[in-house]
Amino acid sequence: MTSLSKEAVLVHAALEERGLETPLRGEVLDRETRKRRIKEHMTEIMQLLNLDLSDDSLAETPHRIAKMYVDEIFSGLDYANFPKITVIENKMKVDEMVTVRDITLTSTCEHHFVTIDGKATVAYIPKDAVIGLSKINRIVQFFSQRPQVQERLTQQILVALQTLLGTNNVAVSIDAVHYCVKARGIRDATSATTTTSLGGLFKSSQNTRQEFLRAVRHHQG
């Protein structure tokens, strides 16, 4: 079994404590077993849809889907894939807001297993530590690579950064298109959903909150 990084263990524990972890079973199968079993079940699903898997266009589809699920779009279910995080002592005593805008994310709606496509804005006010900026993007991507609801995704990113940075002063906003709305059901091709999660000064200070929300509006504009 792959050992987890200290950061992965801390983040997972923080989410569990707050009831924000993705619902997971206790049993963990190894990667190749998961791929094999998903392939078997996907073969059965496609056959039930009356698709001919002897056709060369379809023959490898169950294998491709199994590989995609385990290695790519649901890789964030495995904390062994949690990004390597570099947290640096805040020697410069930075105490102003650090904001990363237009973080592209692609996730999967856990209700219908179709795409959620959007962008995130993440901000924090450093305390004792700062984080490599690309690590913020990687944390967003990690939690996006799961079956998700947008509200939980937003809060998971917030708690992960609060845990790693040792400060509550974190804010996250996500603006996304849900293909369970766009491609099925009501089939509304133009609507988008915005979720925001605020901590520390972003919640208690009106000025700090407004500064963050201006950055969000700039992104949406």
Swiss-Prot record:
Keywords: GTP-binding, Hydrolase, Metal-binding, Nucleotide-binding, One-carbon metabolism, Zinc
Protein EC: 3.5.4.16
Protein name as annotated: GTP cyclohydrolase 1
Cited PANTHER family: GTP CYCLOHYDROLASE 1, GTP CYCLOHYDROLASE I
Involved pathway(s): Cofactor biosynthesis; 7,8-dihydroneopterin triphosphate biosynthesis; 7,8-dihydroneopterin triphosphate from GTP: step 1/1
Similarity comment text for this entry: Belongs to the GTP cyclohydrolase I family.
Top EC class for this record: hydrolase
GO molecular function, one term: GTP cyclohydrolase I activity
InterPro entries referenced in this protein's UniProt entry, alphabetically: GTP-CH-I_C/QueF, GTP-CH-I_N, GTP_CycHdrlase_I, GTP_CycHdrlase_I_CS, GTP_CycHdrlase_I_dom
A single Gene Ontology CC term: cytoplasm
Positions with a binding annotation for Zn(2+): 109, 112, 180
Reactions it catalyzes: GTP + H2O = 7,8-dihydroneopterin 3'-triphosphate + formate + H(+)
GO biological process: one-carbon metabolic process; tetrahydrobiopterin biosynthetic process; tetrahydrofolate biosynthetic process
Subunit structure: Toroid-shaped homodecamer, composed of two pentamers of five dimers.
SUPFAM superfamilies: Tetrahydrobiopterin biosynthesis enzymes-like
